[in-house]
């Protein structure tokens, strides 16, 4: 099997993990009804997953740093499958929380390991595209996994979704066992030493790009549906189609980000993508009550926002190459924190200012990310910058 197909297998695994994380938002009403809890209590399942994912991933990656990446993938995927099995067979809210915690612990390690393996087995000069493919699998869960999961839940009950994910996860474990090569781990790095990485200016600045880019995106995206309905005046019957197109644009943007990184380098792709991100957020607040105009801007926004994902992953992997796995795991945690903080800040502005303000607040966050990017690139020696471009 070619390495290209192996990378696609990793993308499929990433898709399963993403679906398991995001599916809750698509079946929240069914979970609340079946378990006899409020929607707010059901919503905590999302918060718990994100926090466990963010906090446990760096710790687990540090403890398993020297382990063969294929073996680590098998163990982490096994833990993830076990969590989904528990969600499928055990009754009650408390047991479901426990299952979500186990899922999240496995999920974080699976995604980071998939990104690491993809970068290591990719052909020279194609690492950015390889990472983009894995990221695209995770992104696809929003567009395909959540709607498909909703359909399965309506037909067979919401627990069947987790049973299906567990079954597909088991199949993925078998395929990975027979196809992925032995891949060396990184040099073990104690957790305190990982945290000490924040003392390095380029690492702290690099991770701040993730926080402000995705945080700015989250401010607006979290409240996109009510924004389109109440501010842009889009008909509710058309909303699902608009969101589907938005999701497809994110897939295209993610793939383009990897291609652009390989062809034109990190600085051009990162700064260019985030600049377009800001422009589209501002335009979205100016172009209202025009269905075609709003749709075009949404497509460009989604494309620009997600072109940054694989580029930033590759950028972090090149900042400290010998600790790429550690940095990628820290980045996964930062992404989870950014989404949570962005949603929280967006809620504050929606409640105390206006729904229309979220695009401007989101644009401000992305602007800070651009400034951090420019500071990093301008401080690098020309040769180091050339290395990043390759």
UniProtKB/Swiss-Prot annotation:
GO terms for cellular component: plasma membrane. SUPFAM superfamilies: MFS general substrate transporter (SSF103473). Gene3D superfamilies: MFS general substrate transporter like domains. Keywords: Cell membrane, Membrane, Transmembrane, Transmembrane helix, Transport. The chain crosses the membrane at residues 7-27, 35-55, 77-97, 101-121, 128-148, 161-181, 203-223, 238-258, 281-301, 335-355, 357-377. InterPro entries: MFS, MFS_dom, MFS_Efflux_Transporters, MFS_trans_sf. One of its GO terms (biological process) is transmembrane transport. It is a multi-pass membrane protein. It is found in: Cell membrane. GO terms for molecular function: transmembrane transporter activity. Belongs to the major facilitator superfamily. PANTHER family: PURINE EFFLUX PUMP PBUE (PTHR43124:SF10). This is Uncharacterized MFS-type transporter YbcL. It comes from Bacillus subtilis (strain 168).
């Amino acid at each position: 099997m070619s390495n290209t197909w192996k990378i696609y297998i990793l993308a499929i695994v990433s898709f399963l993990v993403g679906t398991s994380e995001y599916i809750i938002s698509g079946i929240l009403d069914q979970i609340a009804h079946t378990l006899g809890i409020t929607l707010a209590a059901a919503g905590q399942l999302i918060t718990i997953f994100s926090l466990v994912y963010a906090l446990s991933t760096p710790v687990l990656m540090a403890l398993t740093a020297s382990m063969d990446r294929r073996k680590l993938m098998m163990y982490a995927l096994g833990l993830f499958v076990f969590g989904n099995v528990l969600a499928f067979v055990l009754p009650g809210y408390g047991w479901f929380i426990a299952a979500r915690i186990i899922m999240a612990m496995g999920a974080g390690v699976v995604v980071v390991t998939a990104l690491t393996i993809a970068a290591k087995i990719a052909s020279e000069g194609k690492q950015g595209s390889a990472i983009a493919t894995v990221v695209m699998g995770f992104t696809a869960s929003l567009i395909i996994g959540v709607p498909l999961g909703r359909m399965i839940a309506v037909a067979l009950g919401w627990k069947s979704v987790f049973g299906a994910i567990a079954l597909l996860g088991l199949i993925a474990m078998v395929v990975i066992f027979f196809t992925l090569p032995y891949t060396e781990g990184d040099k073990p790095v104690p957790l305190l030493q990982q945290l000490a990485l924040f003392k390095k200016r380029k690492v702290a600045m690099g991770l701040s790009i993730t926080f402000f880019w995705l945080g700015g995106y989250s401010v607006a995206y979290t409240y996109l549906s009510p924004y389109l309905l109440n501010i842009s005046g889009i008909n509710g019957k058309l909303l699902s189609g608009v969101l589907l197109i938005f999701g497809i644009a994110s897939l295209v943007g993610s793939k383009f980000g990897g291609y652009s990184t390989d062809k034109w380098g990190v600085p051009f792709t990162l700064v260019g993508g985030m600049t377009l991100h800001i422009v589209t957020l501002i335009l979205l607040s100016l172009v209202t009550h025009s269905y075609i105009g709003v749709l075009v801007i949404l497509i460009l926004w989604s494309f620009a926002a997600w072109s940054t994902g694989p580029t930033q992953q590759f950028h972090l992997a090149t900042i400290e190459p010998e600790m790429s796995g550690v940095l990628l795991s820290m980045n996964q945690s930062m992404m989870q924190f950014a989404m949570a903080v962005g949603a929280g800040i967006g809620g504050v502005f929606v409640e105390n200012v206006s729904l229309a303000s979220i695009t401007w607040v989101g644009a401000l966050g992305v602007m800070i990310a651009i400034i951090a990017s420019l500071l990093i690139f301008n401080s690098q020696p020309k040769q180091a910058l050339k290395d990043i471009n390759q």
